[in-house]
Amino acid sequence: QLGLEVAAIDEEKARQYKAAVGKGVVITQVKSGSAAAFAGLREGMIIYEVNRVSVNTVSEFNQALKESEKTKKVLLLVKVGRYTQYVVLSLKP
């Protein structure tokens, strides 16, 4: 629904994306024209939270997303460069 794919951060991805192993999930793909693309999310960004719930695995990320199907909005805490910021995405019905 968001138009993105994520992966857990293992040692290889931690080196590749300058991230901590097991802390957050990394965006590996963003579909053009999707809610994620519209919000400015890009490959390589790290997602630490979904709706203020910490996510460190793909299954935690997916579970947290399921919780937001009712509200049709998703609040992500994302690492952008050296900083973190909140990004709001609207889910398509």
Located regions from the model:
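C-terminal recognition in membrane/secretory proteostasis and scaffolding
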Residues: 1-93
